[in-house]
Amino acid sequence: MEDLLNEVVPQEDLERFEKKYHHELELDGEVTTDTKFEYAFCLVRSRYTNDVRKGIMILEELARTHPDGRRDYIYYLAFGNARIKEYTSGLKYCRAFLDIESNDQVRSLEEYIKKEIDKEVAKGMVVAGGAALVLGGILGLGIAMARNKQKREK
């Protein structure tokens, strides 16, 4: 799954679908659902976080307004959120997808996200533990210095 998440869209594909998207927007003032999806699909696979976020926004709008393609939109919402390490959102979309249907690829993505969440929690605990040790050390040093000062004054 990690390989799939790290795979990026070729720049020429992204540019082609971006051009198509903007062409439709300029021509008709609207963009077809298919073009929006194609563009969002490329964006969530971009190497740039801002592109991925833009793709997520388009997919969220599609999921709200076009229930026919909801399954695909939800999958790529989970995928895009996982790519930018928004694991809570990614997990939410995985579960929403699995409510619609069972799918091994989505289950694999869900497991990957859960492992990443566990890693984040572990990192947080290490940082908190380290901070507590540093604080304890500083406090201990302060107490020792205060005692030493009291002994000298006697």
From Swiss-Prot:
Residues 146-154 are mitochondrial intermembrane. One of its GO terms (biological process) is positive regulation of mitochondrial fission. GO terms for cellular component: mitochondrial outer membrane; peroxisomal membrane. It comes from the Eukaryota. Residues 1-124 are cytoplasmic. PANTHER family: MITOCHONDRIAL FISSION 1 PROTEIN (PTHR13247:SF0), TETRATRICOPEPTIDE REPEAT PROTEIN 11 TPR REPEAT PROTEIN 11 (PTHR13247). This is Mitochondrial fission 1 protein. It comes from Drosophila melanogaster (Fruit fly). The lineage of its organism: Eukaryota, Metazoa, Ecdysozoa, Arthropoda, Hexapoda.
